[in-house]
Amino acid sequence: MRCLVTGGAGFLGSHLCERLLNDGHEVICLDNYFTGRMVNVAHLRDNRSFELIRHDVTEPILLEVDRIFNLACPASPIHYQFNPVKTIKTSVMGAINMLGMAKRVKARILQASTSEVYGDPAVHPQTEDYWGNVNPIGIRSCYDEGKRVAETLFMDYHRQNNVDIRIVRIFNTYGPRMLMNDGRVVSNFIVQALKGEDITIYGDGSQTRSFCYVDDLIEGFVRMMNQDKIIGPVNIGNPGEFTMLELAKEVLELTGSKSKIVYKPLPGDDPKMRRPNIDLAKKALDWEPTIPLRQGLEKTIVYFEDLLKG
């Protein structure tokens, strides 16, 4: 098949492009390089089935494709708060433009949504039928609300225009090709540990997250697109739950770093806990993560070690 990946030069997008090529598909990678990087897909450029286009999804484009994976959007607080208007426009206008294309060329389209649609959840773990406990005017809202609007658009294009949609909600994902200045906790802790800097925990370290290794996540994407039973939304994440302090200690042990852990005030709007219920993914997609946190961290640490060596 001919597949389009928006945000294809980003962390997740580059891994998805790689997987789709390995599965025998033709791949068009679309990216504006706001957070995506050419180096993430440089190893794919000699592949005859791979095409790279510099384009911003807030502008319309028409391509003949069979499948669209809509991943384009800054996904770390540092990046989406740097330009919040651009962030929400990318989610909303990007969804409108990609759905319009899917409608015209009759392509199946997947929206990479997020666990952030649940806000600071009052239900734990989060199931897909939970509507969330959200702040529409906070500093993270440009990302959270943009993704919620995108889900609404996907459902309405499906109901009104019969567009063939799929929606996945991504929980915290980590792995090689994360940006070093990403601002997300896994990359922060690893880079700080490798540089011998203090490891910064915001709050008292008791807030929890669930960390899914990138290969597991991409497998979930592929299974979601390849089945005809459900359109979603479906939670894709690792239900193993860790506190920030547990993660910091694990990183210190694996890196052998002498870094100290320091505590700083928790930013506003930061969810206290986040963990997916993946019963639907297990049942409908026969999917669950296979890579434990320790193994995934080891692979990610090797990546950042190589990066820091230059």
Q: Which ranges hold each PLM region?
A:
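N-terminal Rossmann-like NAD(P)+-binding domain of SDR-like oxidoreductases, especially those catalyzing
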Residues: 1-173, 215, 299, 303, ...
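C-terminal substrate-binding subdomain of Rossmann-fold SDR/epimerase-dehydratase oxidoreductases
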Residues: 16, 55-56, 172, 191-310
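Residues that form or flank phosphate/diphosphate-binding pockets in enzymes
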Residues: 36, 63, 180, 242, ...
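Short, surface-exposed alpha-helical segments at coil->helix boundaries
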Residues: 38-41, 151, 187, 245, ...
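Short, solvent-exposed loop/turn segments at secondary-structure boundaries
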Residues: 82-83, 177-182
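Nucleotide-sugar-dependent glycosyltransferase donor-binding/catalytic pocket residues
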Residues: 88, 178-179, 210-213
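Short, conserved glycine- and acidic-residue-centered signature motifs
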Residues: 91, 146, 182-183, 274
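A glycine/serine/threonine-rich, flexible loop-to-helix segment
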Residues: 124-125, 180-188
